[in-house]
Regions:
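Short conserved segment of the HATPase_c
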Residues: 45-56
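A short beta-strand-to-loop motif within the catalytic HATPase_c
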Residues: 86-90
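Glycine-rich ATP-lid/hinge loop adjacent to the conserved G-boxes
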Residues: 58-66
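Conserved glycine-/histidine-rich ATP-lid loop and adjacent helix of the Bergerat-fold HATPase_c
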Residues: 72-82
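Conserved ATP-binding N-box helix of the HATPase_c
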Residues: 1-26
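Glycine-rich GHKL/ HATPase_c ATP-binding element in histidine kinases
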Residues: 92-94
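Short beta-strand-loop-beta element adjacent to the nucleotide/active-site pocket used for signaling
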Residues: 28-36
Length: 101
């Protein structure tokens, strides 16, 4: 459960850095499946950034970013049979979803 708390904090911090003034954090439990969705109205991500977002060490930031937050989210989700995905529209915002089985 500490991984989930880390992911929520990390995704919310990413949203704030992207200029979001509204962040929706949703957790839903369906039997043994937990879904985490973090949606913001920040600057969104370019298509190339979305494609590479789960690549270790990939970052669009130039200072103090390791590029490991989203790969860690994917690893955590896949480690228990789940998945992670990103939907983003430049200028409108981003939604990151992870399913933990």
């Amino acid at each position: 459960m500490t991984d989930i708390a880390f992911h929520i904090t990390d995704l919310a911090a990413n949203s704030l850095r992207a200029g979001a003034d509204a962040i929706d954090i949703a957790l839903s439990l369906d039997g043994t499946q937990l879904e985490l969705a973090v949606t913001d109205n920040g600057c969104g991500m370019a298509p190339e950034a979305v494609r590479r977002a789960f690549d270790p060490f990939y970052t669009t930031r130039t200072t103090r970013r390791t590029g490991l937050g989203l790969p860690f989210l994917l690893q955590s989700a896949e480690g228990c049979g789940g998945s992670a995905a990103i939907r983003s529209v430049p200028g409108k915002g981003t939604c990151v979803r992870a399913l933990f089985m």
